[in-house]
């Protein structure tokens, strides 16, 4: 992960926004987008009560997960140029099989660093859903780029920023696969990794539509009636609009 001046991938909406690789200087402001959008509005965050004001420890746990994830150097953000604000983010993680006998990244983080029951439940959801399809083994791949957290500030919604971040996550991953300039932002110890796909857990109708529009293949669907936390099923907290999550993949 570079310190500053991340790669400019595109300008958007007649030059009103720019999309860049996330660097250390962008990280804390990017985490605020999670605080002000993702943790409040994302379906599984609601199911795990991470959206409730008193669950600050859960949000801190997941921001630490995002800080570590960002160190890979494959995360992206969108900046609104007139205000200078970061308004949308994609926290992306290079995922690969750990050495024999070691835990995967999510399992290791869950076991060693998570303190909040709400964050533990969200991590358990992610781990369980990822485990339903062994993407690396089943599709004969050594590495994928996981689009872990995708978020846009509500006041900048419906401008296609999430879709564009998803498209450029694919483009960035393809550039790394081909040994291109995106490698310059990747952590040095990961520069031998070559993602052969982008995968994601789409958790709302909005992200289902993004995945469909961009061309992701749905590998598995799980209704929210199958998950519980603190005496309630996820669907009871999420509401009727978003009924299930999807594990999806875009093969490069």
Where are these regions (language model features)?
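C-terminal/domain-terminus segments
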Residues: 162-177, 192, 217-240
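Ligand-binding pocket scaffold of soluble enzyme catalytic domains
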Residues: 19-22, 30-32, 153, 160-165, ...
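Short hydrophobic/aromatic beta-strand or adjacent loop that forms the aromatic wall/cage
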Residues: 73, 242-248
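Conserved active-site alpha-helix within GNAT-family acetyltransferase domains
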Residues: 177-196, 201-228
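Conserved acyl-donor/pantetheine-binding loop and adjacent beta-alpha core of acyl/acetyltransferases
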Residues: 45, 85-157, 183-187, 220-243
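Extended hydrophobic secondary-structure segments that form protein cores and membrane-embedded regions
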Residues: 19-21, 90, 146-147, 191-202
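Conserved acetyl-CoA-binding loop-helix of GNAT-fold acetyltransferases
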Residues: 149-152, 158-185, 213
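Short amphipathic alpha-helix that is part of the acyltransferase structural core
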Residues: 2-64, 69-132
């Amino acid at each position: 992960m570079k310190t500053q001046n991340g790669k400019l991938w595109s300008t958007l909406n007649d030059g009103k926004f720019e999309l860049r690789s996330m660097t250390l200087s962008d990280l804390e402001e990017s985490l605020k987008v999670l605080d002000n959008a993702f943790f409040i509005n994302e379906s599984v965050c609601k199911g795990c009560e991470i959206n409730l004001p008193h669950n600050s420890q859960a949000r801190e746990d997941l921001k630490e997960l995002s800080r570590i994830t960002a160190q890979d150097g494959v995360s992206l953000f969108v900046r609104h140029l007139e205000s200078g604000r970061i308004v949308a983010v994609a926290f992306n993680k290079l995922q690969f099989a750990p050495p024999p006998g070691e835990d995967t990244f999510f399992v290791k983080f869950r076991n060693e660093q998570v303190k909040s029951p709400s964050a533990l439940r969200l991590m358990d959801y992610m781990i369980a859903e990822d485990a339903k399809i062994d993407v690396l083994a089943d599709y004969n791949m050594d590495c994928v780029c996981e689009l872990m957290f995708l978020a846009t500030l509500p006041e900048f919604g419906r401008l296609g920023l999430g879709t564009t971040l998803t498209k450029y996550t694919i483009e960035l991953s393809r550039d790394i696969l081909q040994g291109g300039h995106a490698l310059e932002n990747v952590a040095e110890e990961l520069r031998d990794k070559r993602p052969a796909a982008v995968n994601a857990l789409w958790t709302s109708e909005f992200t289902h539509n993004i995945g469909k529009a961009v061309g992701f293949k749905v590998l598995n669907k799980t209704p929210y009636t199958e998950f519980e936390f603190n005496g309630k099923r996820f669907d009871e907290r999420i509401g009727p609009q978003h009924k299930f999550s999807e594990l999806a993949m875009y093969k490069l």
